[in-house]
Amino acid sequence: MRSRKLAGGVRSSARLRARSCSAASASAQDTHVTTSAQTACQTPSSHKATDRRTSKKFKYDKGHIVKSELQKHRSDSAATPSETPGTHEPLASAEDGASLLGKEAGGSTPQGTAGPLPGRCGTESDASPAETENEPLPPRHGAPVGGESNGGCPARDGAALDLEQGPGAPLLMDGSALLDDDSNQPMPVSRFFGNVELMQDLPPVSSSCPSMSRREFRKMHFRAKDDEEDDADGAET
């Protein structure tokens, strides 16, 4: 009886140990499963957190770039009006220099010709204040070679008369001015006989018969007429 009880006790203790081991293994498996589930849940949350951080950084970088560009544009726009007055300074200095040169040229001229002359002379003297004394201007087209007239001004009428009286273009022999059908002018000869200049250069034609007077020509004409009448009468008879 005692041996059976001991055997039953040993068996019961072994069973308890096996149960405790199985429970421990089950609890270990449960803890492992829970830890794996927690890690699995934590990984997407960490990914989401990193994605949010990157998106925030990207948005911040974008906003920073846009702000920097706007600041650059503002600085450029603020710098441009400050540069514009500087561009007018050389023009103003050039105008001042031209006025000073004009004053110096006016002061160097004699007192007799200090005032501007009427007409075109005043404009010409004002337009050329920067002319040097050593370099004279070239003569203008149509101006007289002898110099200036009427107190230093080139005479327009004299130049026009010189142009009119001077050797003009050679006259054309085609008579293009006389081609109007409604006009009473005669037709040009060159339209029918070619170049008239070649015809004028030809020597005169020598007459084979000797020159006769007007009376002799009339006598011959009447004689020929009488002969024709006699021939006509003879033919009728």
UniProtKB/Swiss-Prot annotation:
The modification Phosphoserine is found at S183. Residues 1-187 are annotated as: Disordered. Residues 48-76 have a biased composition (Basic and acidic residues). Residues 11-28 have a biased composition (Low complexity). GO terms for cellular component: nucleus. It is found in: Nucleus. Residues 29-47 have a biased composition (Polar residues). Keywords: Nucleus, Phosphoprotein. It comes from the Eukaryota. Belongs to the UPF0688 family. PANTHER family: UPF0688 PROTEIN C1ORF174. This is UPF0688 protein C1orf174 homolog.
